[in-house]
Regions:
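Two-component/phosphorelay signaling modules centered on CheY-like receiver
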Residues: 11-29
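Receiver (REC) domain switch/active-site region of two-component response regulators
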Residues: 104
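Hydrophobic/aromatic residues positioned on beta-strands within the core alpha/beta folds
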Residues: 78-79
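Alpha4 helix (beta4-alpha4-beta5 surface) of REC/receiver domains from two-component response regulators
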Residues: 62, 82-99, 107-110
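Active-site beta3 strand of CheY-like receiver
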Residues: 44-50
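Acidic catalytic/metal-coordinating carboxylates
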Residues: 33-36, 59-63
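Conserved phosphotransfer cores of two-component systems
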Residues: 42-44, 66-73, 93
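Receiver (REC) domain active-site loop signature in two-component systems and cognate sites
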Residues: 55
Length: 121
């Protein structure tokens, strides 16, 4: 079982993640902006964070950088539109994956399985 944080200003996306991943036996929390995500990561040790790029209050890239300052948690980026150069940039910063919306649930589940089965440093 993995502890997963889903960060997206669209509540429906967070609810879909919760339904699907809880069905698979994972614990799923939601945050609706970057600031809330940072606070949650400070308070709880997650195995994986799915982070939207475009959100109010704090853009995903800034939230990503702040999360990486306080935690070693793997972060997967998701967005409705990610240009190839932006995707390379995000991966170079240390994201474990970039997902385009609508999400491919098989790929999401595959990443969760990979993270769960990877020994922590």
């Amino acid at each position: 079982m993995a502890k997963i944080l889903v960060v997206d200003d669209e509540r429906m996306i967070c609810e879909e993640f919760q339904d699907i991943l809880q069905e698979d036996g994972h614990e799923v929390d939601s945050a609706f902006n970057g600031l809330e995500a940072i606070e949650k990561v400070k308070l709880k040790e997650y195995d994986l964070v799915f982070l939207d790029v475009l959100m109010p209050r704090m853009e995903g890239r800034e939230a990503f950088e702040k999360i990486k300052e306080v935690s070693k948690v793997p972060v997967a980026i998701m967005s409705g539109y990610i240009p190839a150069n932006k995707e390379r940039e995000i991966l170079a910063l240390g994201a474990v994956a970039c997902f385009k919306k609508p999400l491919d649930l098989a790929k999401v589940r595959s990443l969760v399985t990979q993270v769960v089965n990877t020994p922590k440093p």
